[in-house]
Amino acid sequence: MLIDFNKEVASSVNNSVLSENHPAAFISSQDDYLSKQLRGIDFTDKDKTWHFTSNGRFALHDILIHIAARIEGMECIVTSFNLSVIAAKLFIRAWDTGLFKSLSFILNAQKRHNFEDAVKLIDGKFPMIFTSIHAKVGLLWNENHFITLVTSGNLSNNNNIERGFISTSKDVFYFDKMWIDGLLNRNAKQD
């Protein structure tokens, strides 16, 4: 169930770290579908942050694709420790249906052998670099929207509890865009 901390406090979450200046939402592990949970969030609201847990019901790729389906013309860069075949297929389907204007991946080089089948699916379709990375970040943007997704979950589904937040703050977006662009620029110089 989606709970706005400004209106109601979830008994399972200590809200003492949340101020009234930072609206948040909690996505409970009892919820059925990601789309049901995210339906109440207006990603066009500027400078908002929503916090969530997943309990294995959705992953980084699921949220990115869901948001891209709601806001047209989104560009996307995603970083992850790994990539599953399912996530790769979902990104390809989303791309083929026009959900993304651009889509790039930054993936962990040391663990690449663990997800080589997924890499083969997207190789040549999307820009992809491999480096030493453990961060799981998704950036979505167009001329009017700047959305950041940071989560403990990778581009793979598991039944573990994952935690993260979604922000529509331009400052948060550019904080992550700056270090991600640094990785992309460093990789371009090595090629």
Where is each model-derived feature located?
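PLD/PLD-like phosphodiesterase catalytic module centered on the HKD motif
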Residues: 1-191
